[in-house]
């Protein structure tokens, strides 16, 4: 088998009104290098290093390996012996799509090792089936900002413009929040008014991106489906929101399931907003870091090593 490395970007999902259907890839990556084990008696060897590497399973319940196993099950092939070297830059359980990087990375690694029998579209459908929703796996695989629309049993992906003048500012606290916990606080039913509110704001968000309208963006990022319920899980959310707006952000939203927060700002104000969010969280007794990250436009990539 030819050795290779799969690199998969972090993602920020929902982006205000786009709950479970909108996400964007960011310039922060997890990597997995796939080689043959040197010991012929070993069928699987997993090594993990980098950020939160000590929390990564090195047995067959590892999510990346589970994605590999799922691929081979779907294609009716036997899993070959594998050595997986996982190198992490993306923190776990922070709302930055770490699970999507494992799923997409595993599926692409398996496809490459098997001789690429599946198309990108087929890999995408497998990834959505594993993740349960498309908003992280779609941009992780394809790059850019992706809107997912259900079409029967499949999902149709539409790439949206994200003007470079709209800078993503990510504020990442030092505590985790699981997707399960963030989903548990959501209601099972919604008022019609909330559905109408989000439909109109998502439509405006598409136009704000398309036309580069910051004034529309500020309004469009509002949401009534998930953020009002998840804010209680994020300490000092109201203060952080107010501080971001005061520092010049168009608006501030929860990245994915949280607890990372996403502010969108122009290039001039973005660095100050990043500092302000860290300081505001520090004042609330929580340590955090912030990054002004570019939108990744390539998605997951494969680099052959030999």
From Swiss-Prot:
Extent of the signal sequence: none
Binding positions (ATP): 91-101
Keywords: Amino-acid biosynthesis, ATP-binding, Cytoplasm, Kinase, Nucleotide-binding, Threonine biosynthesis, Transferase
Major location (coarse): cytoplasm
A GO BP annotation: threonine biosynthetic process
Gene Ontology MF: a single term: ATP binding
Pathway participation: Amino-acid biosynthesis; L-threonine biosynthesis; L-threonine from L-aspartate: step 4/5
InterPro entries with a match to the protein in the record: GHMP_kinase_C_dom, GHMP_kinase_C_sf, GHMP_kinase_N_dom, GHMP_knse_ATP-bd_CS, Homoserine_kinase, Ribosomal_Su5_D2-typ_SF, Ribsml_uS5_D2-typ_fold_subgr
Enzyme class: transferase
Entry EC number(s): 2.7.1.39
HAMAP family referenced in this protein's UniProt entry, alphabetically: Homoser_kinase
Family: Belongs to the GHMP kinase family. Homoserine kinase subfamily.
Function comment: Catalyzes the ATP-dependent phosphorylation of L-homoserine to L-homoserine phosphate.
PANTHER family in the cross-refs: HOMOSERINE KINASE, HOMOSERINE/4-DIPHOSPHOCYTIDYL-2-C-METHYL-D-ERYTHRITOL KINASE
Protein name: Homoserine kinase
Organism of this sequence: Synechocystis sp. (strain ATCC 27184 / PCC 6803 / Kazusa)
